[in-house]
Each structure stands twice: as structure tokens, then as C-alpha cells.
Amino acid sequence: MDISPAEISGILKSQIENFGVEAEVSDVGQVLSVGDGIARVYGLDSVQAGELVEFNGGIKGMALNLEKDNVGVVIFGEDRSIKEGDTVKRTSEIVAAPVGKALLGRVVNALGEPIDGKGPLKDVAARSQVDVKAPGIIPRKSVHEPMMTGIKAIDGMIPVGRGQRELIIGDRQTGKTAICIDTILNQKPTNDAAKSDKDKLFCVYVAIGQKRSTVAQVVKVLEERGALDYTIVVSATASESAPLQYLAPFTGCTMGEWFRDNGMHALIIYDDLSKQAVAYRQMSLLLRRPPGREAYPGDVFYLHSRLLERAAKLNDDNGNGSLTALPVIETQANDVSAYIPTNVISITDGQIFLETDLFNSGIRPAVNVGLSVSRVGSAAQTKAMKKVAGSMKGELAQYREMAAFAKFGSDLDAATQRLLNRGARLTELLKQPQYSPLLMEEQVVIIYAGTRGYLDKVALKDVTRYEKELLVHMRGAKKELLAKLREKKELTSEIEDEIKKALDDFTSKFA
């Protein structure tokens, strides 16, 4: 092939013009020391706080301490393969997680990567930063719609509304997780009947520092009962590093916020935040931040407040969505005045206090009605529930007070005897087995029977049987009445007359 000298310069010019500088410029540093999930890195002068960095072998970490001569990085995963002198690379990304409906029915880790063996996530809507600012005051609206848990004691006396933060607090083995799982299961009938996604309630369950077997059991229950279809499970188990246990609640919250910001409703459960605080304490002490009370760092209050403030009910201009939070805190020997419990009690809009003594005496769910409170109150109840359950909390409080005195005296007047009689039956009526949440209209009928004296003549040992048989009767012969109550959501005089008639008929036949 002959090329004339005149063409040579033209060919060289075109080659030079097409020459690309493919070299990648990245900001790198070196590992000075590593241990206990923390790496000290030299270099990375322009790294941001909370930025994701990458070690050799693809292990990720987050820059938390920005000091004069080094950067403290917490490592997401095993630190065994990281050695002194290794290169660390900036990614210029703040820690983010995948969001959207593609995550429903999946189990993911604290970084949003699937760990359920069902393959990679498909059609992820976006990736969102995990630690963002909570909505301000103007975009919010006061809580006014009920978020039904399906548990009579809670929906009747300590109602939770959409957009509320209600703390579940108690010692180990008092049924805290059981309440959370029942709440998720209770959304199934509503979600199945929903015409659009805006009528559904999507759930996010964040397991922090729990045993793998416990998380597997929860997932199994949700799957068997068809509740995993509208639930995302985020898991950072006890065997995972402290940074991942610290991060998991933020990742879960971001996934829940996507529903809230797109005009839908979501519920997030943090099980439990005590373990997140312990993980954060471990990280902070290893990063040599000064310890405060109980050796927790000074900003442990801010850790939980910025997380829980992201649960909100948005107003009409912002799509009307909501994110409801049920944080769980484990106490030691019922000590509610420890540092983390008092912090979270002061951040949330009420607490459900579970007691070992009640649990052991067979009152389950073991809710202490005296210490539990919802600061939203009856605004988060349907009109029907407000009407039938309004007096119940007061009656039970009076009953407990009287029961304490009744131990001393045997000759009680008729009114006191009536009060004790009614209180004992209400306490019995509020017991509920696990995995059997009730619909709002069923609860209204049962509580109506209790507070309006239909049980006063029923023997105490027969109360549970009365309730079971009443439910069968209502779901069978009276299902139109339940449907009417579900639709109207209030106790009109016509519906009340029908309930009275149904209860009169049933009670007269009950034996």
C-alpha cells in the first residue's frame, strides 16, 4: 500500500485528534492502622463527612472522623483483609441505598444488597442518601388517620396514627417483636382490599443486632401468612460489624421515606434501637470520641432524634403520604430511667410499656395500661372505636387501684364489687394470642360487649370462649353488620341498635 508523504501528516493528525486520555484521576490515601472495624487513613484531604470510601478488594467504608492529620473510617464488613499501607480510594458518594417497590418481599443487608438468595434487585426506582434531613414544619400535617395494629389493648387505649412515632419498650422476652409482627400481619386484609397503592400500608422491618435464627423465623412467619409481599426486611445481625448495625436503621428509613414522599403510606419498625446505640458507642469509643453518660457519646440523642424525626405525616401539597415509626427499646430489669430509654421516650409521641410480671401472669400482650400512653390519642381512632373504648382506660385504672385495696378488706359495697367485676372481665377480654390480629369492626363489637356490661354475668373463665364464639357468630350470621361498620367507621344509632340486638341474642344463648 503506497502512502504519499503528503498523506502521512494527515493520518498522524487524525490519530492525534482521536487520542483520548483514559487515565482516571482519583483521590487516594493510605491505611495507617486498622483494627476493630476502624481504619485510620492518611491522605484523602478533601473527603466529605459520611462519604463512602473503597479499600482494596472492594470493601467499603465510611469517613466519620475528619482530623488534622488523618481520617477515621468505619469499615462495612470484615477488616481482616485490610492491611497497613493499603490504598484507600474516595468514591465522591455519600452512603446511599436502593429504594422503590422492587424491594418489597426482599431481605437486604444494611447497604441494601439482597441476602435472601432470590437474585439481584430488578427495576430499582432510584438510590437515595441514607442520612437526610427530616421534613420541616410546613410540609407536615397533624396525625389524624388510624394505623391499626390489630391488638385490642393498643387500638382501644393507646392508639397509633399514621405518621406517629410510638415506642415499644420492655425487658427481653416480653413480646415486643410479637406486637410488631402482628401489626405487619394486620395490614394484609386492608392491603388486599385496596384499590390503589395509596390505600395500602407498606412495611419495613429493620432487625438490628438480632440472632440470625430470630430474623429467619420472622421472615418465615411473614412469608407463610402472605405479608412479605408488602414488606421489606433490612437485617444487620449480631454477627455483623458495628458500623453495619449503626447504618441499618438509616437504610430502612430511606426505603420507607420513598413511599412517604410518593404519596403512599409506610410503617417502619426498628427492632431494636438499644443495639444500634451500643454499636454507635463502640464505634465512637474506637474513634476516640469523648464518652458521656454510660460511656455513650454525647451525640447519641441526636443519633435517634434525627432518625425518628423522619417519620411524619405530610400535608396535601406534599402528597399526603406518611411514615409511621415503631421503635423498640429493650430495658434492663424494667429500668425506664436509663439513658437510652429516657432519650427515646422524650423523642417519640408515646410509648407502649410491656412488663415481665404481666407477661408471666398470663396477660399477653403484657401492656401496662397505666404507664403506656399515646400522645396523639383519640385523633388516631375511628369514631366508632373512640365511642366504645373511650371509658376503658379509666375503668381499668380504677380497677387496678381498687384491686390493690380490695386485698385488705372483704366487705365491699355493691358499686366497688361491680367495678372489680367489670375490671377483671375487661382485663381478660384484652388478652390476645400471637399472630391473631383483629379487624377494627371486630374489635369495636368485642370492646362494646365488655364496656357495656354484656360480660358482667359471664364467668371469668368463660370470657375467652365468649369472645371466640362471638367472633364466629359475627363473621357468620352478622357479616353484613360488620361490613356496614367497616364502611361507616362510626357508631350510628342504627348500627348501635343492631349491635345491641346481636349481643342480646348471642348472650342469651351463650352458656
UniProtKB/Swiss-Prot annotation:
Site (Required for activity): S372
InterPro entries to which the protein is assigned, alphabetical: ATP_synth_asu-like_sf (IPR023366), ATP_synth_asu_C (IPR000793), ATP_synth_asu_C_sf (IPR038376), ATP_synth_F1_a_nt-bd_dom (IPR033732), ATP_synth_F1_asu (IPR005294), ATPase_a/bsu_AS (IPR020003), ATPase_F1/V1/A1_a/bsu_N (IPR004100), ATPase_F1/V1/A1_a/bsu_N_sf (IPR036121)
Major localization listed first in the record, in broad terms: membrane
EC annotation from Swiss-Prot or TrEMBL: 7.1.2.2
Residues noted as binding ATP in the record, renumbered to the chain: G170, D171, R172, Q173, T174, G175, K176, T177
UniProt topology in membrane: Peripheral membrane protein
Compartments, as annotated in UniProt: Cell inner membrane
Reaction equations catalysed: ATP + H2O + 4 H(+)(in) = ADP + phosphate + 5 H(+)(out)
Record-level Gene Ontology MF annotations: ADP binding; ATP binding; proton-transporting ATP synthase activity, rotational mechanism
Gene Ontology CC terms: plasma membrane; proton-transporting ATP synthase complex
SUPFAM superfamilies assigned to the protein according to its UniProt record, in alphabetical order: C-terminal domain of alpha and beta subunits of F1 ATP synthase (SSF47917), N-terminal domain of alpha and beta subunits of F1 ATP synthase (SSF50615), P-loop containing nucleoside triphosphate hydrolases (SSF52540)
Database matches in CDD domains: ATP-synt_F1_alpha_C, ATP-synt_F1_alpha_N, F1-ATPase_alpha_CD
Family of this protein: Belongs to the ATPase alpha/beta chains family.
Job description of the protein: Produces ATP from ADP in the presence of a proton gradient across the membrane. The alpha chain is a regulatory subunit.
Name of the protein described by the UniProt record: ATP synthase subunit alpha
Organism: Hyphomonas neptunium (strain ATCC 15444)
